[in-house]
Amino acid sequence: MNWKRNLWIAWLGNFFIGASLSLVVPFMSLYVEELGARGSMVEFYSGLAVSSTALTAALLSPVWGSLADKYGRKPMMIRAAFAMTFTMGGLAFVPNVFWLIVLRLLNGVFSGYVPNSTALIASQAPKKHSGYALGTLSTGVVAGTLMGPLLGGMIAQSLGMRNVFLLVGFFLFVVTLWTIFGIKEDFHPVSKEKEVSTKQLFQRIPQKSILFGLFITSMVIQMIGQSISPILTLYIRSLGQKENLLLVSGAIVSAMGVSSIFSSSWLGKLGDKMGNHRLLLLALLYSFVIYIFCARAGTPLELGIYRFLFGLGTGALLPGVSSLLNKITPKEGISRIFSY
């Protein structure tokens, strides 16, 4: 099994998944306004539209992870991409905020492409190269997630917001086909005699305190990274940006992705050499300091520069967590652990 070939194919799939999910970020609050929300309810529904996907994904992800351990990671990747083709593309046709929230909830229910691709590569890459492999893979979703808004802002500015959702649906269908014909997995399901429950799986992990700490760290990292996204356009507007608001918002969000591309692979190799836990601690400290500067930005340009610098640190965060998880997790339960 050529794990490097799968790595780059999964990288491209993750890039399109990340881009598809983030293309809507620059104008989500404006789309909510278009659907009829007014005043303070715009921020509320914008935040709900984004967080509802994360909520249902968090609840259902362990279920998909368990199925991946039984039937393979590739089928779960195909399922996620194909289902999201309709849940994301259908956002172009919603008549009001209620149906927007419903489809966003369903999008989270059927998600799971990224954690299953991560589990796939983690199960195939040699342990000594896990930092490099997972660091490289993470640049795909990070780059897509943070460069997607620039493309989304440009398309929304010129063609209208609803057409962006149709484009997203097309991207996700391409990812479905790409995964079917590109990803190779020699999966051997665990026999029922050797099958372990989730409780037994956790009992087999000796470093339970480390596992719990990594779960908390992962949750905090993703919460910090996504918390500002629903209202970033409104924040940039409050800093004085009036013209080309969607384009500027997309560029500022994407600045973080550009720097993450440069840093993730290199930092992944550095983590393999110096220890992923040391690199993770340094990256957390660095990101904390830069995030404070983001809050004190006085102009859109300053915010863009700070977001770029912040991205340099994020290149070591989730890859570092994934690499450490891979090292302490039994092979037979890697999809379930990564789904959490």
Label the predicted regions.
Residues 27-43, 231-247:
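Short amphipathic helix-loop junctions that connect adjacent transmembrane helices
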